[in-house]
Amino acid sequence: MLDKLIIEFDKGLRTVFAPAQTLRPHPDTGLEEAGLSDLEKRHALGLMRVNHCGEVCAQALYQGQALTARDPATREALKEAAWEETEHLAWTEKRIAELGGRKSLLNPLWYGGSLAMGITAGLLGDRWNLAFLEETEYQVEAHLNEHLATLPEQDAKSRAIVTQMRDDEHRHAETAHALGAAAMPAPVKGLMHLTSQLMKKTSYHI
C-alpha cells in the first residue's frame, strides 16, 4: 500500500513540475511559426496555458479515478486516456515556451482538487466513474472547439495541437460511453461546467 502511495505521489510531482513526454510526434511538427502580433501572441499563449492547465486537471482526475476503479476495463480506459493527456501536456508545454510564456502558477491547486474529485468519482462505482470521464471529455472537446474559433487563423502550430487534442478527447468520451457510462445528471454537468469556467478564466492570466 505504501509503495502504491509513493508511486501515485511521484506521478503527481511529475505531472505538475516535470517536463512531460510524448511517444507520438508533436502535431505541429514541420509547420512554420506564424508572424503574430503582440496581441495575437498573448491570446494564443493564454489559450495554450488554459489547455495545459486543463490537461493537468485531467491527469489528476484520471489518476484518482483509476485508484478507485473496480473493473479492469474501466482502469485500462482511464490509463489510456491519462497517457494521451500526458502527451497533450508535452505538446502544450512546448508551445507555451515557443510563445514566450510560462505554465499556470495555479497548476498545483487545480491538480489537488481534480485528484480529490477523481477519487470521489471512482468510489461511486464504475458506471459513474465512466460518466465523469465521458462528460469531462465532452466538455474539454467543446472548449477546444471554442479555442479553434478564436485562435489566429495564421497560427497553424497552435491550431494543429488543439485539433489533435480535440480529436483525442472525443475518442476518450466515446470509449467511456461504450463501456457503459451512466447518464450524468444535469446539475452535476452544470457544476462541472462552472468549475471548468473558473479554471479557464484564472489560468488564462495566471
Curated annotation (Swiss-Prot):
One of its GO terms (molecular function) is 3-demethoxyubiquinol 3-hydroxylase activity. PANTHER family: 5-DEMETHOXYUBIQUINONE HYDROXYLASE, MITOCHONDRIAL (PTHR11237:SF4), COENZYME Q10 BIOSYNTHESIS PROTEIN 7 (PTHR11237). The keyword Transferase does not apply. Fe cation 2 binds at E85, E137, E169, H172. Its cofactor is Fe cation. Catalyzes the hydroxylation of 2-nonaprenyl-3-methyl-6-methoxy-1,4-benzoquinol during ubiquinone biosynthesis. Fe cation 1 binds at E55, E85, H88, E169. It comes from the Bacteria. Keywords: Cell membrane, Iron, Membrane, Metal-binding, Monooxygenase, Oxidoreductase, Ubiquinone biosynthesis. GO terms for cellular component: plasma membrane. CDD domains: DMQH. The keyword Oxidoreductase applies. Pathway: Cofactor biosynthesis; ubiquinone biosynthesis. Its main location: membrane. It is a peripheral membrane protein. One of its GO terms (biological process) is ubiquinone biosynthetic process. It is found in: Cell membrane. This is 3-demethoxyubiquinol 3-hydroxylase. It is an enzyme of class 1 (oxidoreductase). Its EC number is 1.14.99.60.
